């Protein structure tokens, strides 16, 4: 406990106090676009449609080519026996969990991107789901 009660020397304090420290926003190019993702509001189902009329142009799961990609914890392999994420895409028509990504709004600023996401109206075909691991392993479980 030799550190308790001692003053901490902050090597970056002067630069922060004088405004010289570079933060994330300082490093953004002036013409950078902002992205916000629309997340599913159901636990399981399919996206039937996305009404983008309230936003100028929004990418949805129907606009993005179906190119599978590896996700964290799921390395991609050329071996067909090890391609367990062949149905995973950037945006998903098949919703597998609450919060799954279904659309992307790209805008000139963060506020417009957030407003665009809020304006999207997604219609779903809801499917049954289970919340219990044991029930999920039963034959015929969704």
Language model region names:
Residues 1-142:
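Flexible, low-hydrophobicity surface segments
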């Amino acid at each position: 406990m030799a550190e308790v009660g001692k003053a901490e020397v902050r090597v970056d304090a002067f630069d922060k106090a004088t405004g010289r420290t570079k933060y994330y926003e300082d490093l953004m190019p002036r013409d950078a676009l902002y992205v916000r993702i629309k997340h599913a509001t159901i636990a399981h189902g399919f996206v039937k449609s996305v009404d983008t009329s309230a936003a100028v142009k929004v990418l949805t799961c129907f606009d993005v080519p179906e190119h599978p990609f590896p996700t964290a914890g799921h390395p991609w392999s050329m071996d067909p026996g090890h391609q367990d994420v062949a149905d995973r895409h950037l945006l998903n028509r098949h919703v597998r969990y609450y919060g799954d990504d279904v659309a992307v709004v790209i805008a000139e600023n963060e506020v417009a991107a957030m407003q665009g996401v809020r304006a999207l109206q997604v219609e779903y075909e809801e499917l049954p789901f289970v919340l219990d691991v044991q029930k999920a392993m039963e034959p015929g479980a969704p």
